[in-house]
A protein has these predicted regions:
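A hydrophobic, multi-pass inner-membrane permease signature
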Residues: 1-274
Length: 274
């Protein structure tokens, strides 16, 4: 019986591998191919590789001012993600320990927040009303909320795996609320905090609608807004666009590769308790 099932399982795994390759790997390879092509060859033969040209990267860097925009993106992503992770920790602990009367309702509200659609007009109206339009603090604050629901859900699961006896022991020794969170809870849930931070960072880093709606000053643009300028009503610079995408993606790829071990640890948070 086991031998008869082995072949169908192998075929299914091969099919899944081919499907994953088609859906994820081929688009990446295609963008890389375009980034090293001349505009003329891409327009004449967009599906076949041509001679390798590295000048697309230097042109994209200078024409879109990607150096300044990468610094803006790092600032926006790190600060907004750190704020959403910190606020998520402050919200997650009382939910996990059931210290709030409406903890279940609050947790449900956060869960629903994962599936709410993005609305451009309310975001624009909110930014203008609160003087958060076209400035760095406003752009950062408006990107804290999108990463908050998942941060709360991840941290609630992680905190729930910590024995409640540690809370009682720490408070009997006179430890304050924030002191207990920073000295005891944070070291124990560090992988989950990292995942929440990386998710928030990636969410801000990849945002294209927010910069178009909230920013008009080129000196404030993140890298996605700079790359967006390669689109035109009459002409689009596809090779420079692909080169800009590669440049913008490289820091995130390096970051996730460096944090791979911590990400694997975080995947086990909450699976084993005690």
């Amino acid at each position: 019986m086991r031998g008869s099932l082995r072949h169908p399982q192998l075929v299914s795994r091969i099919c899944i591998g081919v499907l994953v390759t088609i859906l994820f790997v081929l688009p990446i390879l295609y963008v890389l191919m375009i980034a090293f092509e001349s505009p003329k060859h891409f327009l004449n033969s967009p599906l076949t590789p041509g001679s390798v040209i590295a000048s697309n990267f230097s042109q994209a860097w200078s024409q879109a001012d990607l150096g300044v925009q990468l610094l803006n993106t790092i600032l926006y992503s790190v600060v907004a993600s750190a704020l959403s992770t910190f606020l998520g920790l402050l919200i997650a602990f009382p939910i996990a320990r059931r210290l709030l009367r409406g903890h279940s309702l609050l947790y449900t509200f956060m869960f629903v927040g994962l599936f709410l659609p993005f609305s451009v007009i309310p975001l624009f109206a909110e930014a203008r009303m609160l003087s958060l339009y076209n400035n760095r603090p406003g752009y950062i604050l408006l990107h804290v909320e999108p990463g908050l629901p998942l941060a709360v859900i991840l941290l609630v699961a992680a905190i729930s795996s910590i024995p409640a006896e540690l809370d009682e022991a720490a408070w009997m020794e006179g430890s304050g609320y924030l002191s207990y969170l920073t000295r005891v809870v944070v070291p124990l849930i560090r992988p989950a905090l990292l995942i929440a931070f990386l998710y928030g960072l990636l969410n801000v880093w990849n945002d294209i609608i927010g910069p178009v709606v909230l920013l008009t000053n080129p000196s404030l643009f993140p890298v996605t807004r700079g790359i967006y300028n390669f689109f035109g009503a009459d002409e689009s610079k596809w090779t420079l666009l692909a080169a800009g995408i590669v440049i913008a993606s490289l820091p995130v790829v390096i970051l996730f590769a460096a944090c791979q071990r911590q990400i694997n640890q975080a995947s086990l948070v909450g699976s084993v308790k005690g």
